[in-house]
Amino acid sequence: MWLYLLALVGLWNLLRLFRERKVVSHLQDKYVFITGCDSGFGNLLARQLDRRGMRVLAACLTEKGAEQLRSKTSDRLETVILDVTKTESIVAATQWVKERVGNTGLWGLVNNAGISGHLGPNEWMNKQNIASVLDVNLLGMIEVTLSTVPLVRKARGRVVNVASIAGRLSFCGGGYCISKYGVEAFSDSLRRELSYFGVKVAIVEPGFFRTDVTNGVTLSSNFQMLWDQTSSEVREVYGENYLASYLKMLNGLDQRCNKDLSLVTDCMEHALTSCHPRTRYSAGWDAKFFYLPMSYLPTFLVDALFYWTSPKPEKAL
């Protein structure tokens, strides 16, 4: 009985592997628009697709980032300045993309731009601390998608949205996890709606990788800022030891993160170039073998694990 079951599982995986290896034809004629290309996943993906001969339209936040990217790629790659929090910037970038793709449409949209913002207890936050992250990671992503999706539909192309394993498990307070849960929900509804037009939507859920999002200096500085802005009553409840423990954890975060960003960009590339892309990609061994399985556990077990492994407030019961 068990041997038959194992054989069926093995056969299924072989068939899936064979099916997923089939590549889309005429990649050199396909346009891909990527946000957040100054550094990290977006920067590496832009260079990766450029090497494959695709027509990369890379959106950067700064001119410096755009210049550095152009210096490392072929003349095929083009850059545009885009701030996903500003409607006028999105409108201008969309028009720029439309002028380049013409009647062929846009084969791929990769929503990669994102920030970590302030991470910490929700009680320490104000509305702006959370809204500033949602503006980039969620609302900006949605507006870019709504603006460019007619071009993607014309090409019967792909939308690739970068979520996170933090869209499956809420590790901490603040806007980051909220935004990534939102990316998951928006992508699920978008995938079903666009399936009628031959458009495929994929979600990439990276684990912990060494990028600007996991920069320990930035995260600990933002955490200290939260501590300084909260009331004396709240500081008394949490205590200095809690602050020190959390700062130590954040300062060492990037050292514990995976440096091989290609584990993520390979998933993005597959979603754009495979005839049969996956709906979801878990990128990184921590995501595949720890955080994703953990997300399927009963809630009380997940809560208990976080309770026993997280810093404790001074006035905790």
Curated annotation (Swiss-Prot):
Active site (record annotation): 176
Tissues/organs with expression: Liver > kidney > brain > lung > testis.
UniProt xrefs under CDD domains: type2_17beta_HSD-like_SDR_c
Chain segments annotated as transmembrane: 289-308
Modifications made to the protein after synthesis: Not N-glycosylated.
GO molecular function terms noted in the UniProt entry: 11-cis-retinol dehydrogenase; all-trans-retinol dehydrogenase (NAD+) activity; androstan-3-alpha,17-beta-diol dehydrogenase (NAD+) activity; androsterone dehydrogenase [NAD(P)+] activity; identical protein binding
Keyword vocabulary terms for this entry: Endoplasmic reticulum, Lipid metabolism, Membrane, Microsome, NAD, Oxidoreductase, Steroid metabolism, Transmembrane, Transmembrane helix
Cellular component GO terms, alphabetical: endoplasmic reticulum membrane; intracellular membrane-bounded organelle; organelle membrane
Membrane topology term: Single-pass membrane protein
Primary location recorded for the protein, binned into one broad class: membrane
Pathway of action: Cofactor metabolism; retinol metabolism
EC numbers: 1.1.1.105, 1.1.1.209, 1.1.1.315, 1.1.1.53
Top EC class of this enzyme: oxidoreductase
GO biological process, one term: steroid metabolic process
Binding site for NAD(+): 33-57
Binding site for substrate: 164
InterPro entries reported in the protein's UniProt record: NAD(P)-bd_dom_sf, Sc_DH/Rdtase_CS, SDR_fam
Compartmental location: Microsome membrane; Endoplasmic reticulum membrane
Gene3D superfamilies membership: NAD(P)-binding Rossmann-like Domain (3.40.50.720)
Function summary: Oxidoreductase with a preference for NAD. Oxidizes all-trans-retinol, 9-cis-retinol, 11-cis-retinol and 13-cis-retinol to the corresponding aldehydes. Has higher activity towards CRBP-bound retinol than with free retinol. Oxidizes 3-alpha-hydroxysteroids. Oxidizes androstanediol and androsterone to dihydrotestosterone and androstanedione. Can also catalyze the reverse reaction.
Family the entry assigns: Belongs to the short-chain dehydrogenases/reductases (SDR) family.
Domain notes for this protein: The C-terminal region plays a crucial role in controlling the activity of RDH16 and its required for endoplasmic reticulum (ER) retention.
Protein name stated in the entry: Retinol dehydrogenase 16
Species in which this protein is naturally found: Rattus norvegicus
Gene name of this polypeptide: Rdh16
